[in-house]
């Protein structure tokens, strides 16, 4: 997948989308996280299953929050690549994930996100996001 497509503005907006994804999840701003997805957006992972549409994504935020058990999560996104075709884009990146509680790392995971993005009302959003686990770090 080449990452040299689209305008500079598109490229920066997509990078910002990825940063906001991590920031909103890690800081428990789930309503803002939901707004990063299209109305028919989906999220899928081995651990949490597949969640589709606004109601499904809202359910995911509750399940995810409860899974933390008070721990602080950190999503570190790297190696972002994407190809833009008009108002759609295919993208992938690496995820380094950890969560800590009482000063100790309780979980550390390495994964790959595979995404379909769509521009809606002038903003890039996730149409679908799939988490592909590499294993435990």
Task: Set out the residue ranges of the language-model regions.
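Beta-strand elements of well-folded, non-transmembrane domains
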Residues: 95-101, 119
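Outer-membrane beta-barrel domain signature
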Residues: 37, 43, 100, 136-137
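Short, conserved clusters of charged catalytic residues that mark active-site
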Residues: 16-17, 77, 112
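Short, low-complexity N-terminal intrinsically disordered segments enriched in polar/charged residues
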Residues: 1-27, 31-35
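Short beta-strand edge/turn micro-motifs at domain boundaries
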Residues: 90, 110-137
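Short helix-to-loop capping/linker segments positioned immediately adjacent to catalytic or ligand/cofactor-binding
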Residues: 5, 22-23, 67-70, 102
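A solvent-exposed, acidic/Ser-Thr-rich amphipathic alpha-helical stretch
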Residues: 30-95
